[in-house]
Every structure is written in structure tokens, then in C-alpha cells.
């Protein structure tokens, strides 16, 4: 079998540069090592009489790994449905299946079609065998395409008719696959980790959690290892779901790369993966068996809403108000703050940079301006040079002499009713958000470098009293507040609060 799988992988490398519509179709072929690992995740006791779906089959890399797994388990028959939109790949799919003809009886259908259309129509057509539950799949293995779905597209409308709301082809493929499975059916797929959190994938997460149980999730330590031949830099996760079964503990594994030579594995109660009261249904993937400082302390249990603090995305989208932007402050302008203006506890303003420093105050922009005051800002996008995912800064009213200020769209702003918050709370939030424990905790459930307002709303914070104490300490030691000092002071305050509880 090894020789056959090597042949399929050589074919993958040969065909990859020949793809004419790779970007348009969001095609990324699966390397042999990943295909084999994914095929090994299926339960041994469920492999007989397999009815297999490979959606976005490519040249058949995943199907070949699945067939090799069946053969290794001495199973002599498989029923395959391979869906592929690119008709150029049909002969390669046929060649892949032909490699196995002497080893296993294959009943296969290669369907050259748009999977979303094929699946949605199959589910919506009352006369369809799939819609009538007469023919469902027992196994699905997929590496779906990566491409955004336009809001007014045919795909979006079809998905909505099928009861699915999602924004990317990969989540659409997985959601439809879930609906095409029989109860007890197993689905193994590899997609970007970004589906685990954020508002855009909330409906998708709900769809999965309502209809399946999560059995296993696997991560790679390096974000560029899964599809290195395609130079994909997104962090990917391999997941195994089971349709219609009771949720139990979840296995989390991690490997350094796609050789899978060294794998660490842990088991977690499901409530550690998806917190029971989380309406966003964020999926937390902890890759160590150690509890973070945030998890250790039960007094870190407050949401921003419970602390009477709001968070909003900076409302000024600069390209929409180009005519109002000014390189430097001048008559009739007010400050416009970008992420680059905030460095530690300091505001560097005005600043020589490519971005403007000011915006004309007029009727058009007035609705986006905030009264001057104490605000905490969190950069939405962290740069490669920054060690932390969450990078927070503080605006103080004495930093500028203007009655109102603007925050650009690259910032999240913590405020109260679109006004400033108390000085002590602002500095306390600044220190807490910039702490190492918060960074570690955030990385557990955030698969990308973007920090959204929703991420901050779902985070847990210490009590207002602890934030005030932390803030007072920052104010008193403003010149000597480094990473080590912040981490040490936060732990001290949390331990003292726990001891007094």
C-alpha cells in the first residue's frame, strides 16, 4: 500500500502546477502524510460496509488513504462517492481508484459537479434518496476548498434554503456533509482553525454542536506545515466528528509538523472545550495539559458587560472618508488614532508615519467621534514582530487638548456608553490584557492573529476591585511597568483575592 500511496502523492505534485482555476476554486491538495493520519482517525469497529463521501476529492488523495486503511483492516468492499467540480481532475481520480482494483472491491461514483449545489439539491428534493434518509453516508473524509462566499451569491442562497448560514466554502462543505451523514456516521476533515471562534462562524459552530459530537481535534505547532507545498500560512486543524451521538470527553493532539513523528495527546471534558454558558460557542483547543493562570483562579469570571464596560470596533474607516483625512493636526481637525500611535502606556502623537494623524470634524464624521477621556484600545491585528496576540494601549484625556477624538477601524475600543472609563480601571484593563497569562489563554481558542470585539466580549476578567488595584499600581509605577512586573503583580492580586474569599 505504501507504494500506491507514494504514486498518488507524486501525482498530486505533478497535477498541482497544472491547475488552471486554483484560486477561483480554492483548491489545496492534501499531502500523503496528512491523508494517512486522517484515515487513521476512523473507528476500527465501524469500517465494515462503509459508504464514503469525499467532497472536493481532487485527485483522490484522501480516498486512497481511506482505501489503504480498509485494506489494512482486511475489509474487502467499499462504496464511494467522490465529488469534484474540476472536470480536468476526473481522469486522475479514475487512475487513483484503478490502483486499488486488485486489493478491494470498489463500488464508486465519480461525480463532476458543484458539491454545494449537488448536496443542497439532494437534501431539498423530497424525492431524493438522501432527503428521504434512505441513503446516507457512514464515513466522510474531506479537505474542502478555502474561499469566501459572497453574500448575494447562488451558493449563499442555496445554503440558506438548506438551513445553513456560513461565509466560506470550507465551512459550507462541512455543514452539508454533516447533514448527509447517517446517525453514528464519522466525519474527518481539515480546515482553518479560524472557525473555532469569531462571529462569522457562530452559526456553523452551532450547526456542528447541535448535530454532532466532537471526538478528536489535532493541531500543528507550526502554522505553515500542513500545506507547505501550497505556501498556506493559515493555522489548520484536523477534526473528527460523529453524527447524532452523545458528547463525551474530547481528545486533543498536537504534532510539530505533518510527519506526525512526535505527537502529544490530552483528553479534556467537553465543558473545557466549549464553555456551557458561552452563547458564541467558541471552541477552545488547549494544547498543553497545564491550566493557565486565568483558569486556575475562579475569581477571573466576569465579562466586560458584567463590569459595565463596552467594546466596539473603531468606527472610522479611513478609505471611506479620504477627503477628511489630514497628515497632521490643524485648524478644524481632531486626532484620529491608529494602532501605531499606542506604544506601551504611552501615546505617540502626532507621529511621522504613512497614516494620517487627524480628521476634519464635520457633520459626516461627528457620529463616529468619542468625547476625550480614558479609553483602553486593543489592536485588532498584531504584527509579526509582536510577541503577544493581544496588544493593548491607553488613551488619557491629557494626552491631547481636543474635546473629541477618532478611533480608526484597526482598533477595538473599551468604553462606557461611548464615553471614557475611570483612570484606575483603564490602567487595570491595560495591564490585565497585556499580561502573559491572558496571552496564553487567548491563544488556546484563537487560531489567528486577529482580535475581534466579540473575542473581547467573551473573555473573562477579574473583578472591578482587582482591576482598580492593578490600575493604581500601574499609575504609581508608570515608568517601571514591564512584562515581568505586570505578570507578577497580577498573580499577587489574584492570589490575595482568592485567599480573602
UniProtKB/Swiss-Prot annotation:
EC class: transferase
GO-annotated biological processes: DNA restriction-modification system; methylation
Presence of keyword Methyltransferase: yes
Top-level taxon of the source organism: Bacteria
Molecular-function GO term, any one: DNA binding
Keywords: DNA-binding, Methyltransferase, Restriction system, S-adenosyl-L-methionine, Transferase
Catalytic activity: a 2'-deoxyadenosine in DNA + S-adenosyl-L-methionine = an N(6)-methyl-2'-deoxyadenosine in DNA + S-adenosyl-L-homocysteine + H(+)
Lineage: Bacteria, Bacillati, Bacillota, Bacilli, Bacillales
Gene name of the encoded protein: hsdBM
Enzyme Commission no: 2.1.1.72
UniProt family annotation: Belongs to the N(4)/N(6)-methyltransferase family.
Name of the molecule in the record: Type II methyltransferase M.BsuBI
Gene3D superfamilies recorded: Vaccinia Virus protein VP39
Pfam family, one: Eco57I
Keyword Amino-acid biosynthesis: no
